[in-house]
UniProtKB/Swiss-Prot annotation:
Coiled-coil residues: none
Protein name: 6,7-dimethyl-8-ribityllumazine synthase
Gene (name only): ribH
Alphabetical UniProt keywords: Riboflavin biosynthesis, Transferase
Function text: Catalyzes the formation of 6,7-dimethyl-8-ribityllumazine by condensation of 5-amino-6-(D-ribitylamino)uracil with 3,4-dihydroxy-2-butanone 4-phosphate. This is the penultimate step in the biosynthesis of riboflavin.
Classification lineage: Bacteria, Bacillati, Chloroflexota, Dehalococcoidia, Dehalococcoidales
Active-site feature positions: H89
EC number: 2.5.1.78
Pathway: Cofactor biosynthesis; riboflavin biosynthesis; riboflavin from 2-hydroxy-3-oxobutyl phosphate and 5-amino-6-(D-ribitylamino)uracil: step 1/2
Annotated source species: Dehalococcoides mccartyi (strain ATCC BAA-2266 / KCTC 15142 / 195) (Dehalococcoides ethenogenes (strain 195))
Amino acid sequence: MGKEFSGVLNGQGLKVALVVSRFNEFITSKLLSGAKDSLERHGVSADNTDVAWVPGAFEIPLVAQKLAKSGRYDAVICLGAVIRGSTPHFEYVSSEVSKGIARVGLDASLPVIFGVITADSIEQAIERAGTKMGNKGFDAATQAIEVANLMKNLG
């Protein structure tokens, strides 16, 4: 039988960067708090956690790429909130942000985790930032720890 690989939820020694959108900060600040909570609970030192603020979600992939390619981090967590309005802007931004974040991870061979809420309403975004639907920032940080450790196990 062949080998089976998995990542563990132990963040000791991991260095993590977070890229956070300032737009919709009343949501993204809750995502950031959730992410920091997960990192701390799983043993990532606050000294090994860096945060880069960007103006909006569209700028997340560029900054994530710079951090991912720096060689200083085991994972990059991308946090933002894109809320549908009355124009097609939502579709353009959410599509390009998700594609950009995925490309950064593939290009850098590093876990670059998508923690961007795409919601039809402010209420939906609030639900996903720590109320009814959990906190997507917490979830993204937990995923980052697991995948960073999996990547280390894969060599």
